[in-house]
């Protein structure tokens, strides 16, 4: 599971201790935006086996690659209108994020060459992290090959994660606002989310 929108080392370390597989750092306009320098400082304190994912929105490949190299990112998440041309130019594993409004979004996802596909709620002011779910039923009949690399996001929290995993059976789940209190990451909510997610993934 991925905890996204990390901005401080204490929360990052706690998430890793509780069993997070990946942490997300947002390098785009967001309530959780972080500078490359701050992200690098946090990443240096993290276990080697935890994935460090940088989130970008319509950024140039050159800037993405520069930040990835400087910070020590293991993956980049493309949360804007990026296409396969940009994906191919990256020399780091990629995640393409798509907003879901209908079954056709799932079909369109199969055309992307990213290593993983992240299904999220439709974008609003910010791309992602809006705390809203979408109809998981739209993803129920996903092809097996797509499901193997599918990440589920969008309004997940400790109360709905069990239903989400049972319905969609994703490769990974991604949470941000669902583990926050008054806009700040809440380590107790992170702990409860991870416990619930691991329970229903057994």
UniProtKB/Swiss-Prot annotation:
<keyword id="KW-0028">Amino-acid biosynthesis</keyword>
<dbReference type="GO" id="GO:0000162">
    <property type="term" value="P:L-tryptophan biosynthetic process"/>
</dbReference>
<keyword id="KW-0057">Aromatic amino acid biosynthesis</keyword>
<dbReference type="GO" id="GO:0004640">
    <property type="term" value="F:phosphoribosylanthranilate isomerase activity"/>
</dbReference>
<comment type="similarity">
    <text>Belongs to the TrpF family.</text>
</comment>
<dbReference type="InterPro" id="IPR001240">
    <property type="entry name" value="PRAI_dom"/>
</dbReference>
<protein>
    <recommendedName>
        <fullName>N-(5'-phosphoribosyl)anthranilate isomerase</fullName>
        <ecNumber>5.3.1.24</ecNumber>
    </recommendedName>
</protein>
<dbReference type="InterPro" id="IPR013785">
    <property type="entry name" value="Aldolase_TIM"/>
</dbReference>
<dbReference type="Pfam" id="PF00697">
    <property type="entry name" value="PRAI"/>
</dbReference>
<dbReference type="InterPro" id="IPR011060">
    <property type="entry name" value="RibuloseP-bd_barrel"/>
</dbReference>
<keyword id="KW-0822">Tryptophan biosynthesis</keyword>
<keyword id="KW-0413">Isomerase</keyword>
<comment type="pathway">
    <text>Amino-acid biosynthesis; L-tryptophan biosynthesis; L-tryptophan from chorismate: step 3/5.</text>
</comment>
<dbReference type="InterPro" id="IPR044643">
    <property type="entry name" value="TrpF_fam"/>
</dbReference>
